[in-house]
């Protein structure tokens, strides 16, 4: 994940994106909301039926960390809910060992470590543009939209 300020890259953060079959949708987004110690709404399938379970922050099954930065795809409603988020502190070693081989990945959301996310959530205002591009085709001049264009 690359962070820009005034068209200059100021930070690179190791990130996890969607695994095969649950790819992070490529496109232009904006940060629509931010929540500290968010409730996690997890899709689950039980007996062939899909449901959404609300898991409060602090619960042993909560996996998204201390911050949620919800994203809205520009020009259309978000199909589902994508956001930049962290990982439950008690599961960091397990999660990052499993996912940072780049073969597994997330269920679609960009994931970063909570220490970086804490910084970003405080620094980045709502409405900030987020461009999700294919990592092997990323090109700063073509894909980057500076904050002044937001």
Spans of features found by a protein language model:
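Exported/periplasmic cell-wall-interacting domains
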Residues: 47-150
